[in-house]
Structure formats: structure tokens, C-alpha cells
């Protein structure tokens, strides 16, 4: 049974931990608001751009003049997985859920005889994937110095992907991130960015005249579309990370409070038992006299 001193020290230690988790929860809440606003502000632009490109892609179709970013290489042998996670932990299952989805996708592709290459964005995904998929790594993007996520970061990642695609290093590129829905709900998502995939009809491009041509406009828009999708994913990831951290730190703070209550009860019982024992010894000594 722990001594009163040990129990007192444990109570003090848990109280200090609760202060830290509470502070981290408040910081995450402040960051979440900014990250959520940024993610929500980017969605209309991304949706509008996708609608325009969808219409153009529908008109261009699979013609010989279709841009390579739309038509693809004609093969799906080599897949590049871009796994986006956080630089830090203490955010519940945020990082592990994205890694789990990427790992399952990689396993499926390898089973089909495909070649898998992995580009990690963020420290935590790299750490977790290195254990069993490290031999497939081809690069890493360090976000530790990024204070606020901006479009230039996405442009840099997009340029790297486009350069690798032009060099024939892969056929299909898929990004993995968490789509923000609420503080307690972040959805791990896999989204193909190269070659471009469009669903629905989008804008009716026959209502417009394009110069120099629909193919030319689409060829110019597609690289921007890749950067926009990556930027949107980074913003969604940022909001999801802060939401997950806020929720995790709230749970940790609650658990610390429960532990303090249990330890306090144990401390009071032990103290009461010690006092009772001391009184019995005093009474027994007095009776002996």
C-alpha cells in the first residue's frame, strides 16, 4: 500500500499534468477556429475550379489531344502515395487513422503486383510507416518550420509531384489526409490527384468559347488543380489535427480530474486509518498503565 507521502506526490503530479492538458486544450481550441475558417473558406474556390475543369474534361474526353494529366500514362503500374500527417502527436487517433488507411491501400496495391512509392508530409506519418514500408519511401516534406499553412507550401508539393510525373516516376498519385467534419469527427480520406479524376457533368463548356482551345485551357488549369487539391487537403488536415487534439486533451483533462478524485479518496482513507491506528496505540498504552 503506498504511503501518505507517495499519494500526496502522485496527486500533485496529476494536478500538474491536468494544468498542462487544460492549457493544450485551450491552445488547440484557438488554433482550431482559425484552421476551420481557413478550410471552409477554401472549399468554394476548390469546388468552383473542379466544376469548371469537370466541364472541360467532359468536352475534351479521351481525345488524343487530351492533356497528359487528364489522360494519364496509359498504365497504372506505379503508384505514389502522398501521406499527410501532423508534425506532433497528442492528437488522439488522428495520425494513426490516416496511416492505417494508407497502409491498407499500399497492401492492396502490392497484393495486385503494383509498385508502391511513398512521399510523406509531416513527421508522424513517416515515423509510423517507416517500420514496415520504409523501403518504399522516396521523399519527405518537413512542415516543422511552417507556422501557418499557406498556398506556397501546397505549390511546392505540387511542383514536386508534377516533376516526378513528367519524369515518368509514377503513373498514379493519391493523397491521404483527414477531412474535417467536426471536433469529434475527422474522416480519413484517399483522393487521387494524378491523373485527374472528375465526377459529374460540371459546367456546360459548350456555352463558352475558349482561347486558344479547350485542351489548352485545361492543360493550364490541371497543374493548378493539383496544387489546389493539395492545399485544400492540408487545410482540412490542419483543422482535423486541432480538432482531434482539442478532443484528446479534453479527455485527458477529465481523466486527470477523475484520477485526482480517486487518489484523494485513497489518501483520506489512508490518513484516517493511520490516525485510527495511532489512537488505538495511545489508548492501549494508557490502559496498560
Swiss-Prot record:
Is Cell inner membrane there in the keyword field?
yes
Biological process GO annotation list? proton motive force-driven plasma membrane ATP synthesis
Tell me the Gene3D superfamilies matching this sequence. Answer: 3.40.1380.10, ATP synthase, gamma subunit, helix hairpin domain (1.10.287.80)
Output the superkingdom of the source species: Bacteria
Primary localization class, coarse = membrane
Q: List the disulfide bonds.
A: none
Q: Where in the cell is it found?
A: Cell inner membrane
Swiss-Prot/TrEMBL keywords:
ATP synthesis, Cell inner membrane, Cell membrane, CF(1), Hydrogen ion transport, Ion transport, Membrane, Transport
Q: Could you state a single Gene Ontology molecular function term?
A: proton-transporting ATP synthase activity, rotational mechanism
Q: How does it sit in the membrane?
A: Peripheral membrane protein
Cellular component (GO) terms are:
plasma membrane; proton-transporting ATP synthase complex
What is this protein for, i.e. what is its function? Produces ATP from ADP in the presence of a proton gradient across the membrane. The gamma chain is believed to be important in regulating ATPase activity and the flow of protons through the CF(0) complex.
Q: HAMAP family per the record?
A: ATP_synth_gamma_bact
Subunit composition and interactions: F-type ATPases have 2 components, CF(1) - the catalytic core - and CF(0) - the membrane proton channel. CF(1) has five subunits: alpha(3), beta(3), gamma(1), delta(1), epsilon(1). CF(0) has three main subunits: a, b and c.
Q: Which family does it belong to?
A: Belongs to the ATPase gamma chain family.
Q: What is this protein called?
A: ATP synthase gamma chain
Q: Give the species this sequence originates from.
A: Cereibacter sphaeroides (strain ATCC 17023 / DSM 158 / JCM 6121 / CCUG 31486 / LMG 2827 / NBRC 12203 / NCIMB 8253 / ATH 2.4.1.) (Rhodobacter sphaeroides)
Q: What is the organism lineage in this UniProt record?
A: Bacteria, Pseudomonadati, Pseudomonadota, Alphaproteobacteria, Rhodobacterales
Amino acid at each position: 500500500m503506498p504511503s501518505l507521502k507517495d499519494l500526496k506526490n502522485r496527486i500533485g503530479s496529476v494536478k500538474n499534468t491536468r494544468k498542462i492538458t487544460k492549457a493544450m486544450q485551450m491552445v488547440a481550441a484557438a488554433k482550431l477556429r482559425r484552421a476551420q475558417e481557413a478550410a471552409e473558406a477554401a472549399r468554394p474556390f476548390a469546388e468552383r475550379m473542379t466544376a469548371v475543369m469537370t466541364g472541360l474534361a467532359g468536352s475534351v474526353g479521351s481525345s488524343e489531344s487530351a492533356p497528359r494529366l487528364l489522360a494519364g500514362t496509359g498504365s497504372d503500374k506505379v503508384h505514389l502515395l502522398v501521406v499527410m500527417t501532423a508534425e506532433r502527436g497528442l492528437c488522439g487517433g488522428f495520425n494513426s487513422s490516416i496511416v492505417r488507411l494508407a497502409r491498407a491501400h499500399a497492401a492492396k496495391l502490392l497484393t495486385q503486383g503494383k509498385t508502391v512509392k511513398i512521399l510523406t508530409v509531416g513527421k508522424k506519418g513517416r515515423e509510423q510507416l517507416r517500420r514496415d514500408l520504409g523501403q518504399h519511401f522516396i521523399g519527405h516534406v518537413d512542415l516543422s518550420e511552417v507556422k501557418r499553412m499557406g498556398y506556397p507550401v501546397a505549390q511546392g508539393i505540387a511542383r514536386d509531384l508534377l516533376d516526378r510525373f513528367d519524369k515518368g516516376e509514377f503513373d498514379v498519385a493519391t493523397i491521404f489526409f483527414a477531412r474535417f467534419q467536426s471536433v469529434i469527427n475527422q474522416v480519413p480520406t484517399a483522393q487521387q490527384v494524378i491523373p485527374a479524376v472528375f465526377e459529374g457533368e460540371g459546367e456546360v463548356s459548350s456555352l463558352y468559347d475558349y482561347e486558344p482551345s479547350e485542351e489548352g485551357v485545361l492543360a493550364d488549369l490541371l497543374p493548378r488543380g493539383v496544387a489546389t487539391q493539395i492545399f485544400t487537403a492540408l487545410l482540412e488536415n490542419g483543422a482535423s489535427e486541432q480538432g482531434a487534439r482539442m478532443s484528446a486533451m479534453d479527455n485527458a483533462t477529465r481523466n486527470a480530474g477523475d484520477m485526482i478524485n480517486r487518489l484523494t479518496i485513497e489518501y483520506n482513507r489512508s490518513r484516517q486509518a493511520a490516525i485510527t491506528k495511532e489512537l488505538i496505540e495511545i489508548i492501549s498504552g494508557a490502559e496498560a498503565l
